[in-house]
Every structure is written in structure tokens, then in C-alpha cells.
Amino acid sequence: MIRILLAIFLFLSCYLTQGQPVGEWFRLRQHAHDIGVDSLCAQPDSACVTRYFAQIVYGRTPRRMRYQGLPEVIDSVRIARLTRQFLGGTDWCSLLDSLESHDRRYRQLTAYCMRCLVDDYMGDSLTIEQVQETLNAYRWLNRFRAETRVIVNIPSAMLRVSDRRGNTVFSSRVVVGKPSTPTPLFTAYIPSVVIYPYWNVPRSITVRELLPKIRKNPAATLNAMNLQVINAKGQEVDPKTINWATPANAFPYRLRQSTGCDNALGVLKFNVSSPYDIYLHDTNARQVFARENRQLSHGCIRVEKPDALANLLLGYARFGADYLTSCAKNASPKTVLLPKKIPVIILYNVLDIDEAGAIRVYRSGYRP
């Protein structure tokens, strides 16, 4: 049905304007507007057409993207060639097919967007804005042409690994940041996996959540949570020598949780090269993946199937089916470099396509 709708739309667009330069220009601007491309310019000169084509292929940076650690690659030669063809009289229909992404999800969302624009029942302004934002995000992904990409969508609390053509080769539920500690939107690389990681407790969690508990009974609380006290030199400090009455903002130590199945990061951690203390990791509370609302973390991204994800990124089956549950206690952390660092992209698409191929509007708990 989706393909039929797209075919009808494209046929009418081309039939009504074929061979008419003014009509072709109108269709270009109208199509760009329909899929959420801003009105860039008014005259069909080379510079203006180039700007439209660049956004139709590569989109614009999504709103609230806080950090971009991945290099963007835009094929300017391709855009220039398409511009010359358009200005030389090539019909819009043939150019559109070469411009638009062949990603199944993008095609499905484009058809849905066209239906929203002509159907008053479906096409409320909020829905149209949401689908256009998601279409832009998919176009923007074309700037990152790696063989493998890890993509996390915050509203759906899902992670997927896609290939160069956008096909999903792996997916997993995740837990993302809660409204008070949201996961930021960014792009970066995953360079390595840590086996049996320490959890170096963030300062904010130490001050706001842990110190008040520890002060009541330092030895018992630290022992129950497998926490170590570390000084500025990275040395472990005997808790009995610490003045726990020191004001929280002047507390000179950091807390570190020992490795093992009880560690908050679980037994696998995926390092992420960004300015944030944000990474992907296993967890010691896997029951939360069954919840519909998985906006629960302090900002990091907990992965339901970290062993399978690690095997995929490493390129071989290093971790067996029972690896997550048969872990050693107090094992030393070990960092394993990936054969090639993998791009990771954090997005915020309220409207998207789920793993079953259905269009979903997800609970929008916060705006990052």
C-alpha cells in the first residue's frame, strides 16, 4: 500500500510538471516543504537549487544536538551533478528517485507524511511536525556513511545497529536518562569495550545520593554497595580514617564500585569518546527492561543485550550466552579495542517506526 501511494504521488508530480521548468521548480520547492525542508530561497538559480538538493539528501542538524564528534561527509560532486541535470531540463521524477534515501523506514515515513498532509483526520499540525522532524533525522544520518552505526532513539528507548544502507542488523531495548538527568543528544565513537568495569561514581550522585546514606553508617553502607573510597592520587583510602562530617561540597574523595555482577555497570561497558560522562553499559538491574517507560537512568544508556552488541562490534563471538550471569567477583577491568571504532548517534524521534514496521508515537517524557 505504501509503495502504491508513493508511486501515485510521484506519477502525478511528474506528469503535471514534466517538461515545464517553472512547474519543475514548483514541485521541487513543494516537495521540500512537504518533507520539512525550510524555504531556503525563491529563485531557481544554481545556488538555490544546490541548497535544496543538499537538504533533501543530507538534512540539517537536528534541534538540540549538543555535541558532534563524528566527521560529516557530504558528496558535493553528486549534489552539483544533480543541480546541473535539473537546470538542464531533466524531469523532477527521475531526479527525486536518485535524491531520496532508499532506507525502508524513510520511504515508509515519507508516504505517511504525504497522507497526513492530505487527510484532515491524520494530518494535525503536531503529527506533521513530528514526522517531518524524524524524516530530517533520517536524511541527516546520510552524512555518516560508516559500514556500521549504533543509533539510540531516546523516546522509544531502543538501540539499533544499521548498515550503510540503513538496514537494521541488530536491535535492543535500552534504558535512557530520566527527565531530571536526561541523556544528551550527540554523535561520537565507540572505541572499545571494558570487561568487568569499575563504576566511578559521578560527583553529582556521590554528593546528592550516596553521602547522606553513608554518613549514617559508613562501614555497613560501603560494604553493602561494594564501594571503595579513592583519593586524588587514585589510591584506596581506609574509610575509618575519613571525616564523614565534611560538607558534601568539600568532600575530597571519589567513590568507586568494585567489579562483578552487583556492579551498577554490570560486566560490560562501551566507552564513548564524548565530553560527557555518558556511555553504554550492562546493568545489575535487568528487570527494568520489561517496563514500557525506560527513562530511568542518570543519563547513561543501559543495554539489554550488551553481550550480543559487543560480539557484533568486535566481529566475533567472544561472549557466550551465560557470560552476563556467571561473572567473577572483584575481577580486574580489561579494555578491549574494537577492530574499528564505531559511530554512535543519539537521537530524539518522538514519531518513528518500531521493530515490527509500525509507525509509533512514543511517550515524550522530556526534551533533551
Feature-to-residue mapping (PLM):
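Well-ordered beta-sheet/strand-loop patches within structured domains
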Residues: 20-24, 33, 70, 74, ...
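Cationic-aromatic interfacial patches
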Residues: 20-75
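Bacterial Sec-dependent N-terminal signal peptides
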Residues: 1-20
